[in-house]
């Protein structure tokens, strides 16, 4: 079958790779000059299935109000003048109940755990290298309230059989030796030894090369204007003056997926703006060995070979990609507070990207009401974590195979109107 994949971020490239492995003739189209040049370019570098969780959680609405008055708040909201933003935020608020959080987190962990299995198989099969490390993830708590609040996440981890370790301040140095100097600032940590790290852009670039070796064609610097529709099916992709035709089409355009298919269906994928800095390591002993999550500031600090990536925060501000100096200040403050002297933040590069986020946190992967149109978008901050599993899942669906995991609650159908004309809740 001929398949066109729109988008060459980590999700699009993974889709193309697994489709090619399944025997399909695949073409990837992207407006950029190469793979992983937008949201996948400088993310936090984490593959964290155990920390797969929706931003919509109990207590978040009250926290959001408090964060409005904090200098280093992890969340910021600025109205972008669209009705869609207001609708999306309302849907997110509806998912901030304990019941919905548990369901949403459960299915996110399901996909993320499967995706890690797919990544490990990929690595074993191909030997792909991307400055990867398998040292686990350590979530750091600065208050007793944060530590106590981790109980609900631990319950989900136990239910999903995800291994974890709850560490005291004195035990943190066993996972991250450099934290010994700052353990007095912390109340403990939750470590997931099965999590991994690496350079997502490097991974995507090398996966694209592997896909090319399987026959995938990449068309970069190509405009993606619209889908041509005939007889209730997709008849092609309009790329400037050319129409590219195939048997099936995959939309993996991240935050831009929403507007691109708006004439066909409505999907609640909104851009969640995030930031990162990447600093050279100047003192190996003072740098992290794997990756940590600062629960207070929602910031991840990740070790690459000779660099430290510091990323996080969320701004609900539309498609604004301006770099805000105050956000860089927060990132530098966090890494210098936990790993002082480990990296030279004065020489750090500064980046921002738009994560495609759904209000319930779960991505949209699978079939649509249009028989030959498939979606693979809405992964939020977990694009790399979920990319291989989403790509394999999509390849199975397009190939007519039964997926290895439950997939019906991952598709766009959970958002579409039921027979009574009511929009289904995101967790249905």
Curated annotation (Swiss-Prot):
Cysteine disulfide partners in this protein: none
Cofactor(s) this protein cannot do without: FAD
Gene3D superfamilies the record matches: D-Amino Acid Oxidase, subunit A, domain 2, FAD/NAD(P)-binding domain
GO cellular component: cytoplasm; plasma membrane
Positions with a binding annotation for FAD: 3-17
This protein's UniProt keywords: FAD, Flavoprotein, Oxidoreductase
Pfam families: DAO (PF01266)
Gene Ontology terms for molecular function: D-amino-acid dehydrogenase activity
Cross-referenced InterPro entries: DadA, FAD-dep_OxRdtase, FAD/NAD-bd_sf
Catalytic activity from the UniProt record: a D-alpha-amino acid + A + H2O = a 2-oxocarboxylate + AH2 + NH4(+)
Protein name (Swiss-Prot/TrEMBL): D-amino acid dehydrogenase
Organism, as annotated: Burkholderia ambifaria (strain MC40-6)
Lineage: Bacteria, Pseudomonadati, Pseudomonadota, Betaproteobacteria, Burkholderiales
Name of the gene encoding the protein in the UniProt record: dadA
